[in-house]
Amino acid sequence: MSSKSQLTYSARAQSHPNPLARKLFQVAEEKRSNVTVSADVTTTKELLDLADRLGPYIAVIKTHIDILSDFSQETIDGLNALAQKHNFLIFEDRKFIDIGNTVQKQYHNGTLRISEWAHIINCSILPGEGIVEALAQTAQATDFPYGSERGLLILAEMTSKGSLATGAYTSASVDIARKYPSFVLGFVSTRSLGEVESTEAPAQGEDFVVFTTGVNLSSKGDKLGQQYQTPQSAVGRGADFIISGRGIYAAADPVEAAKQYQQQGWEAYLARVGAQ
C-alpha cells in the first residue's frame, strides 16, 4: 500500500482525493496538532466540558457515545457547537460489526443518530466487505444530508495484547479500503500499512490516513491488556494522528496534558517530514 507519510499535512491536503481527509489535514496544519483525544467519560456534562477545555489543542475528539448515561439532543448540539468553536472533527468509535442492513440503521437512524454529528466512524471487516459497502451506500445516497463531510476508518489493527487483527485480516482491510476510496479515509492501525500485501491495485493518488490508538506518555500498559506507545514512536511508525485517552483526560491537569501531547506529536511529525 502506498504511503505519503513523508509529505507535510498541507501538501497532502492539497492533493488528497477525499474531501474529508483534506479537511482533516487542514485542521491539523492550522492548529499544529495531530492529537485525537479519546473522551471516555460517562456524562454529557463531562464530555462537553472536556471538549471545550481541550478543543484548542486537538484535531479530533473521539467518542464512545454509547457509554454516556444521559445521551440526548443536548449532547449532539453541544458537540457540534464546540466542533465549530474550536475547529476539530468528531470521531465516533462505534466499531460497527454486523450485517450491512443492520449497520445502515445503526449509523443513520436509531437512538444515537450517529450520522448527524460524527464526521468519522469506524468498522471492523470481520463481517466481510458488505459492511463497508453498506455504510458507503448510506453516506453517498442522494438524500443523505451530510455528503462529503462523512468518512470511514477501517479497524485494521488493535493495540490490545493478543489482538487477532493481524496478518490476513489486516491485508483484507487494505483490499477493501481500496475499493471504496471516496468513503474510506484510512485505518486505525499501529503503523503505516505501506508494506502490507494487497490483491487490489492502488488508485492514483492513494493516501490513506493512519490513526494510532494507545498513545500514552506515562504508562506502557494496563491490567486489561492495553499496550501503549509514545507520540514519537507512534508517529515514527506511520501514525498521522495519535489517539490518547487516559493519558490526557485522567491526568491531574488535562489541559496541560493535551498541550504536552500536542507539542510532542507535532515535533514527531516535523521530524518525520524533515521539517526540523
UniProtKB/Swiss-Prot annotation:
EC number: 4.1.1.23
One Gene Ontology term from the biological process aspect of the record: 'de novo' pyrimidine nucleobase biosynthetic process
InterPro entries reported in the protein's UniProt record: Aldolase_TIM, OMPdecase, OMPdecase_AS, OMPdeCOase_dom, RibuloseP-bd_barrel
Keywords attached to this entry: Decarboxylase, Lyase, Pyrimidine biosynthesis
Residue ranges of the TM segments: none
Catalytic residues, chain numbering: K95 (proton donor)
Keyword Kinase appears in the UniProt entry: no
Binding site for substrate: 40, 62-64, 93-102, 228, 246
Keyword Lyase: yes
SUPFAM superfamilies linked: Ribulose-phoshate binding barrel (SSF51366)
Gene Ontology CC terms, in alphabetical order: cytosol
One MF annotation (Gene Ontology) recorded for this entry: orotidine-5'-phosphate decarboxylase activity
Record-linked PROSITE patterns: OMPDECASE
Enzyme class of the recorded protein, top EC level: lyase
Pathway annotation from the record: Pyrimidine metabolism; UMP biosynthesis via de novo pathway; UMP from orotate: step 2/2
PANTHER family: OROTIDINE 5'-PHOSPHATE DECARBOXYLASE (PTHR32119:SF2)
Name of the featured protein: Orotidine 5'-phosphate decarboxylase
Organism: Penicillium nalgiovense
Higher taxonomy: Eukaryota, Fungi, Dikarya, Ascomycota, Pezizomycotina
